[in-house]
């Protein structure tokens, strides 16, 4: 998997402020590799301007927003709800 610059900033924030979120993100990414489009975090295909992207819950407030192309998972955000 790879992280966009924005998603890498989100992950760096969690590494500094909440390691449980980092663990959850890692678990979600492992599950995406194994089970996409099903699995943990209530996977949801996004619509409209975010077409082609998927979302999974990190917690009530925060979402992991990503795409899957061939065998590559690209993470676009992992903080807040569907981006800023």
Functional labels for PLM-detected ranges:
Residues 1-3:
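Conserved N-terminal entry element of GNAT/NAT acetyltransferase domains
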Residues 6-23, 27, 40, 46-47, ...:
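Enriched for short, Lys/Arg-rich terminal
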Residues 31-32, 49:
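Low-complexity, intrinsically disordered/propeptide-like segments
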């Amino acid at each position: 998997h790879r992280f966009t610059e924005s998603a890498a900033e989100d992950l760096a924030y969690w590494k500094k402020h909440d390691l449980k979120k980092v663990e959850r993100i890692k678990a979600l990414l492992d599950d995406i590799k194994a089970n996409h489009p099903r699995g943990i975090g209530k996977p949801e295909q996004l619509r409209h301007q975010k077409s082609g992207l998927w979302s999974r819950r990190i917690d009530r407030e925060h979402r992991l927003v990503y795409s899957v192309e061939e065998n590559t998972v690209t993470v676009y955000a992992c903080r807040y709800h569907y981006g800023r």
